[in-house]
Amino acid sequence: MPSFLRRLQVAPWAVAAAGFAMMFASGAIWGSFTLFLVAIEADTGWSKTTIALGFTVFTFFGACTAPITGWLTDRHGAQATLAGLTLVFALGLGLAALADSPLAFYASFGMLGGFGAQCCGSYTLFTVAGNWFRRPATAMAIMDSGSGIGTLVSLPVLRLIIEAHSWRAAYLALAILALVVVLPLAAIFMRLHPPGREPPPPADGHVAHRSPLAAIGAISASPVLRWLAIVHLLAPMTFHAIGSHQVAFFQDAGMRQDVAVLLVATTGFTFFAGRLAFGALIDARGIATAGAIKAVAAIATLGLMLALPLLASAAPAYAYPVLFAIGFSSTGILFTNAARLLIDPASFNAVFGAMRLLYGTGVALGPPAMAAMVDATGRFDLPLALVGAVLLFHHAAFVALARGAGRRGAR
């Protein structure tokens, strides 16, 4: 390896920049499903529920294979593991572009894509940020904000590719993005610890803490961790129920598709700004204050969506990207920092891994649940009202947990 690359490998700013670029690709991947949902339905005639089930397989398979990713990381290191996952992900998207049936779509995009998408997942990047930086929430925000820019840039570009060619060509473009951006950055920069600061091997007495069964036992035995687990399940469920149907919702409310896509793409920029702002806020004022602000904005977002079809003008919709970002952009950063405060350090990796499994399950369940409700009712208002009730519950639970952590003197 050239000497200048070896120097870059140990420069924290370079690690943060690499994380930002990898999350840019993640934003293009995750943020674009709302666009593919509409395009695949129009091309194939499959129902929204059928297509959304592919996203469910994608997220759930990624969550269920997270322990394998952790084992591979322990055995071979993050750089080799993430590089290998990138190749699997690119293969999955390439095969998805050839899918001619829902089952083929589930196997390619869902299973291979879901497993491989961990190559640019926030879990590993947030772990890197926590080990490399003294202000971890700010570092996490800098990395995670790349996904917002990725969504902002990718949605208009992918829409043009879909209109000029097809959704299949757009999936091939995402596969190329992963190979060109994620693969080299993961292989070069994604070391879990700075040189010379690697943790010592665990003592025999702590090996059991790395077991999934021990993690489940720790969660079951602690009321605080049980509530944290519930929040990890419900929060991504509500976010992705909304996020996967944004374009369809705005079109149903009477907005032209190009305007709807532009509005959703704008959330990429507002998420970028929101994550940076919340990272600094968490480091400065703690997770309770940040969580309360997030809760108010999330509820306001649902209120706006419910009111929009009833209004004579669509002008209030232009507040949506700002409200949506304040209400939802900081979820991963908040949860990671809450976990660092509430989980015993001796068992952190295993317990937080179980939390991320629940998080992935919530991501998997949200889109098909929303799609099934919309398909069954033929409308968006009743499903959105139900999502709003769940959203209110889990935000209240998180704020209570955060205040409890603050009373124990933690931030």
Indicate residue ranges for each PLM-predicted region:
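Hydrophobic core of transmembrane alpha-helices in multi-pass small-molecule transporters
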Residues: 24, 104-120, 233, 316-330
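Extracytoplasmic gate region of multi-pass secondary transporters
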Residues: 33-37, 220-278
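Interfacial helix-cap and linker-helix signal at transmembrane-aqueous boundaries
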Residues: 40-41, 72-73, 156-165, 250-251, ...
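Conserved MFS/SLC helix-loop-helix module at the cytosolic interface between two early adjacent transmembrane helices
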Residues: 64-102
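Helix-to-loop junctions at the C-terminal end of transmembrane segments
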Residues: 65-77, 274-287, 374-375
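Cytoplasmic helix-loop-helix junction between adjacent transmembrane helices
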Residues: 109-145
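Helix-loop-helix hairpin linking two adjacent transmembrane segments in secondary transporters
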Residues: 143-194
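C-terminal transmembrane helical hairpin of 12-TM major facilitator-type secondary transporters
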Residues: 267, 271, 284-338
